[in-house]
Amino acid sequence: MAASIFAAVPRAPPVAVFKLTADFREDGDSRKVNLGVGAYRTDEGQPWVLPVVRKVEQLIAGDGSLNHEYLPILGLPEFRANASRIALGDDSPAIAQKRVGSVQGLGGTGALRIGAEFLRRWYNGNNNTATPVYVSSPTWENHNSVFMDAGFKDIRTYRYWDAAKRGLDLQGLLDDMEKAPEFSIFILHACAHNPTGTDPTPDEWKQIAAVMKRRCLFPFFDSAYQGFASGSLDKDAWAVRYFVSEGFELFCAQSFSKNFGLYNERVGNLSVVGKDEDNVQRVLSQMEKIVRTTWSNPPSQGARIVATTLTSPQLFAEWKDNVKTMADRVLLMRSELRSRLESLGTPGTWNHITDQIGMFSFTGLNPKQVEYMIKEKHIYLMASGRINMCGLTTKNLDYVAKSIHEAVTKIQ
């Protein structure tokens, strides 16, 4: 029999976070803990369907007027409009001036990809693959892949995490922006930076915006955790809204996976802020062409759940309460873990655990210590030392804290 025409195809390495979860599932040890999963978990370690989502799903199922016809190519209009409103604010002048457009995407990744595909085709000259794209060091690993696969050839990093002080390297970040070529694209985490959990303060964001404006750099925000970081939708959108108020044209990729718990519905939105309505409409016309050959038409269920919730004052209030429940549990786990590590006298400082916000924490554990945690203690976390605070529960906190203490004291 002739060899397969695919015989020369190399096997791609597995996606790290999904491989980690697979390894966790196969582990038969009763003490095992999964701190790698990128999703919310209850104190029982279980997925949580938001009560408001259950309620809206029942409303949708009972609505005889709904059908399964195609949506518009750019997505469900009431979802797109309200998603952008959540990002930019009820009183957004940009929305009032009709210079905001949006595209429904397949989750935050889909929103990022449509933005990247458009920028490669039309930003800084037609089909300019040489425009530098800057991602934070470190960043969510998919940022690199999305922009590379969209055709950008020059992906660079800007300094962000200061390992020595376990916090933001503001001066390094600003210096890298000063040195970046004009019209470079900068991927900015709107809140709850992944993986570090370390965000700039409002004053630091102002300094970042000032440099970006002077250097003519393009802001592309990734907003995956609005409401989940601090418990406040407005506080978590502060940076995006400030940049808009400063006159920036920008993109903002939004994900509703975390704050609605709709991970497998793939609900995302790309908000486009332009100088005027005409510019935005021309951008959307090109994005429509890109969507047509990418997924052609988005799914409706998740978008309908979000739109129904955001347009009802009662459901919106209930959703905010659900989001705060998740955010508060994360804050509690941060406080409890830090307290236990300090009580154990674990070497180093641990205030960064409570200084950071959002689902993830950059522990500061090195790869050898991480390996020890996985192999000896059956506690699964990313090689970078990133942990998902939602993987902690009142039942496993003591075990995790003692294991971190052991790893830090035994392994250098």
UniProtKB/Swiss-Prot annotation:
Function field: Biosynthesis of L-glutamate from L-aspartate or L-cysteine. Important regulator of levels of glutamate, the major excitatory neurotransmitter of the vertebrate central nervous system. Acts as a scavenger of glutamate in brain neuroprotection. The aspartate aminotransferase activity is involved in hepatic glucose synthesis during development and in adipocyte glyceroneogenesis. Using L-cysteine as substrate, regulates levels of mercaptopyruvate, an important source of hydrogen sulfide. Mercaptopyruvate is converted into H(2)S via the action of 3-mercaptopyruvate sulfurtransferase (3MST).
Protein name: Aspartate aminotransferase, cytoplasmic
Molecular function GO labels: L-aspartate:2-oxoglutarate aminotransferase activity; L-cysteine transaminase activity; phosphatidylserine decarboxylase activity; pyridoxal phosphate binding
Keyword Cytoplasm: yes
Description of how the protein assembles with itself and partners: Homodimer.
Keyword list, A-Z: Acetylation, Amino-acid biosynthesis, Aminotransferase, Cytoplasm, Pyridoxal phosphate, Transferase
Reactions performed catalytically: L-aspartate + 2-oxoglutarate = oxaloacetate + L-glutamate; L-cysteine + 2-oxoglutarate = 2-oxo-3-sulfanylpropanoate + L-glutamate; (2S)-2-aminobutanoate + 2-oxoglutarate = 2-oxobutanoate + L-glutamate; 3-sulfino-L-alanine + 2-oxoglutarate = 3-sulfinopyruvate + L-glutamate
Stretch forming the signal peptide: none
Domain of life: Eukaryota
Source organism per UniProt: Gallus gallus (Chicken)
Compartments, as annotated in UniProt: Cytoplasm
Entry-linked Gene3D superfamilies: Aspartate Aminotransferase, domain 1 (3.90.1150.10), Type I PLP-dependent aspartate aminotransferase-like (Major domain) (3.40.640.10)
Alphabetical GO biological process terms: 2-oxoglutarate metabolic process; aspartate biosynthetic process; aspartate catabolic process; aspartate metabolic process; cellular response to insulin stimulus; fatty acid homeostasis; gluconeogenesis; glutamate catabolic process to aspartate
Class in the EC hierarchy, top level: transferase
